[in-house]
Amino acid sequence: MIINCNPSIGREIKKRRPAIVVSANHYNAVTGMCAVCPITDTKYKNHIALDKRHKLQGYINPFQIKTFDFMEKQRNIRFVEKATLAELGEVAQIIDMVFDFSSLLSE
């Protein structure tokens, strides 16, 4: 998807940019929100390269998860294409590491 991330402050996702939706369809439908990870041109450690066959090129930043009201017209959202299962799997692994739910639940 392409989404307008403004307004934002500090080091938050800025401007109109590509992003990958990481929230479940049920969550999106119930809340009218979607959680995304931005896609950037810059390669950093643990960013995930998009498959070369995609229309969009760049790197998924799984460390900067943000929720957006996708019903808000100012977000100017446009669907581009679906991520591969491999890309989603890598993103999910890093998001799991970020939140460390298994550790929280075992305490």
Range-by-range predicted roles:
Residues 1, 34, 48, 58-60:
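A broad, low-specificity signal marking well-ordered, structured residues that form hydrophobic/aromatic
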Residues 6, 24, 103:
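Flexible loop residues that form catalytic
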Residues 1-9:
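GIY-YIG nuclease catalytic motif and its immediate N-terminal context
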Residues 52-107:
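C-terminal terminal-subdomain/extension
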Residues 11-16, 20-53:
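Compact nucleic-acid interaction/catalytic patches
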